[in-house]
Amino acid sequence: MFRIVNGEDYSPAVQQRNILDFGKAPSLLWTDNGSSNDRCDTGGNCRESGQDRVKRPMNAFIVWSRDQRRKVALENPQMQNSEISKRLGYDWKMLTEAEKQPFFEEAQRLRAMHRDKYPGYKYRPRRKAKEATEIASRRLFSTVQPNAHRGDLVPLHIQGHTFTNGKPVKPLTAHEHKQLTPATGASQQSDKPAPQ
């Protein structure tokens, strides 16, 4: 049932051990050499090797959860990572401020080290492709103005296509267009229901 590829065992136990071993070496998280190869070793995205991307310093929760994640995973080898994360979030909330204080201090120390090492650092979150598409779509359709009489969106015409609420629709007939035009049809025909 377990796969062995190129002589390596991919059983759940081995995968769990590999995950746990990764967190044991703090040198993997913070390296002195900021080369692209180090970013691949630290869990960064190797596809970004051409860019000089600097990771954010760890916050107090991340500092605390590194060791806790390892402990929870050892106690519950079958527990999924998402479930471990939920449990860690709950456990962190249950800690008192006094219990959290050493981790806040460590996070502050790491921030200071990070600031010294990267003085011009500014956090620039990476946008996912889907988010960029949604933002472009919102900008495109932000020019659509509400119709004063009906409260609906006025159709937006772009190169022979009509869009309403960001979705293409069939072109209006002359009669439909006349009914939707505020100056002529909608105000004069108030006794008739508007077409839906």
Curated annotation (Swiss-Prot):
DNA-binding region positions on the chain: 54-122
GO molecular function: calmodulin binding; DNA-binding transcription activator activity, RNA polymerase II-specific; RNA polymerase II cis-regulatory region sequence-specific DNA binding
Compositional bias segments (type: Polar residues): 181-196
Pfam families to which the protein is assigned, alphabetical: HMG_box
GO BP terms in the entry: cell differentiation; male sex determination; sex differentiation
PROSITE patterns: HMG_BOX_2
Keywords noted in UniProt: Activator, Calmodulin-binding, Cytoplasm, Differentiation, DNA-binding, Nucleus, Sexual differentiation, Transcription, Transcription regulation
Major localisation: nucleus
UniProt keyword Transcription present: yes
GO cellular component, one term: nucleus
Keyword check for Repressor: no
InterPro entries (UniProt xref): HMG_box_dom, HMG_box_dom_sf, SRY, SRY-related_HMG-box_TF-like
Localization annotation: Nucleus speckle; Cytoplasm; Nucleus
Region Disordered, residue ranges: 33-52, 164-196
Record function comment: Transcriptional regulator that controls a genetic switch in male development. It is necessary and sufficient for initiating male sex determination by directing the development of supporting cell precursors (pre-Sertoli cells) as Sertoli rather than granulosa cells. Involved in different aspects of gene regulation including promoter activation or repression. Binds to the DNA consensus sequence 5'-[AT]AACAA[AT]-3'. SRY HMG box recognizes DNA by partial intercalation in the minor groove and promotes DNA bending. Also involved in pre-mRNA splicing.
Description of how the protein assembles with itself and partners: Interacts with CALM, EP300, HDAC3, KPNB1, ZNF208 isoform KRAB-O, PARP1, SLC9A3R2 and WT1. The interaction with EP300 modulates its DNA-binding activity. The interaction with KPNB1 is sensitive to dissociation by Ran in the GTP-bound form. Interaction with PARP1 impaired its DNA-binding activity.
Similarity comment: family membership: Belongs to the SRY family.
Annotated protein name in UniProt: Sex-determining region Y protein
Encoding gene (name): SRY
